[in-house]
Amino acid sequence: MVSLEKNDHLMLARQLPLKSVALILAGGRGTRLKDLTNKRAKPAVHFGGKFRIIDFALSNCINSGIRRMGVITQYQSHTLVQHIQRGWSFFNEEMNEFVDLLPAQQRMKGENWYRGTADAVTQNLDIIRRYKAEYVVILAGDHIYKQDYSRMLIDHVEKGARCTVACMPVPIEEASAFGVMAVDENDKIIEFVEKPANPPSMPNDPSKSLASMGIYVFDADYLYELLEEDDRDENSSHDFGKDLIPKITEAGLAYAHPFPLSCVQSDPDAEPYWRDVGTLEAYWKANLDLASVVPELDMYDRNWPIRTYNESLPPAKFVQDRSGSHGMTLNSLVSGGCVISGSVVVQSVLFSRVRVNSFCNIDSAVLLPEVWVGRSCRLRRCVIDRACVIPEGMVIGENAEEDARRFYRSEEGIVLVTREMLRKLGHKQER
């Protein structure tokens, strides 16, 4: 393990990102989000009033000083590709800055699409090698968080690791959804199990397990060697968590990086924020978190901006209807192009170009872009997919049986409404 002085840290914080390439795994469908991902990959799902989920990983790279990125796509990639082309095309290739789109290719040696997360990188090795990076940062494109990857790179170099895995404690009852690890006093990973049925607890806290966040730093040459070896293994599932990380752990070359060391927070006393919005309830809750008085995730931090594609839209407008009722909101996010006419919106997130007509009451709802809400509607604890036309007088979120019959209702009572569901009920979706 190498001990570095403060000046060395500052120098490495500038140099290491320039020697790195980030690969963002963005090909997943996200089946637990149900119909929300029928026509788009999970990283392309809207979030936070104006963003896409992948904007967080991309923005973290830019803010960390990493200017070379590859986005690995597969499932329903058109929306994702379009978003990146529109919103992330400001790089200067002459300065060796870029975002490369790396789709599944079905290469000549086989007929498989990506067989796993590791295989997604393996199939693009010929392209990735041309980047001539010293370090490769592997990221999931479907998590919500702010992280300075330069701090993780420094930790990787200081510990003399060949592979570093970002980790954080999670409640033990949730740990089966993650890779779970045990570490020694130097953060060397001594045991790693992917999605165990009975997760081991942390020695100092029996209520929690130490979970992998799916964020990795590799020495580039070591990663390429591992991937080529894994590609030849017919018994491998070609996945980082299931195959590569356990193998590296056995070799004694994997170290853990505690997420609090690199989590970017405006309030140093706040809990580190990282969310896997993989279920409808988690997605709904993470959106509404941003509408709270003091949200856990600070989206207003000028020192760590989250970038996205910005349309040219007029400001949101709140107007009174013909009866004199005023449009008003409380504890809500309302994006550009929205019009609220004589209705009340409480603790909700309205994306761009949403129109709420008179006499409506909207509470704890997430309305994606271009939703049209007819008069006298009541919407509660729901997610309304893009461009839905909610007919006049419709009530959602008040009758569990009725919601489950017409739409998708989760076990937690969150209702998802899509255009296809509304069409099946006989409601036209063209305005």
Curated annotation (Swiss-Prot):
Alpha-D-glucose 1-phosphate binds at Y114, G179, E194, K195, S212. PROSITE patterns: ADP_GLC_PYROPHOSPH_1 (PS00808), ADP_GLC_PYROPHOSPH_2 (PS00809), ADP_GLC_PYROPHOSPH_3 (PS00810). GO terms for cellular component: glucose-1-phosphate adenylyltransferase complex. It comes from the Bacteria. Changing G336D: In 618 mutant; causes lowered affinity for AMP. Changing A44T: In SG14 mutant; lower apparent affinities for substrates, fructose-1,6-bisphosphate and AMP. InterPro entries: ADP-Glc_PPase (IPR011831), ADP_Glu_pyroP_CS (IPR005836), GlgC_bac (IPR023049), GlmU/GlgC-like_hexapep (IPR056818), NTP_transferase_dom (IPR005835), Nucleotide-diphossugar_trans (IPR029044), Trimer_LpxA-like_sf (IPR011004). Changing K39E: The level of activation by pyridoxal phosphate and fructose-1,6-phosphate is only approximately 2-fold compared to activation of 15- to 28-fold respectively, for the wild-type. NADPH is unable to activate the mutant enzyme. Pathway: Glycan biosynthesis; glycogen biosynthesis. Homotetramer; dimer of dimers. Belongs to the bacterial/plant glucose-1-phosphate adenylyltransferase family. This is Glucose-1-phosphate adenylyltransferase. It comes from Escherichia coli (strain K12). The gene is glgC.
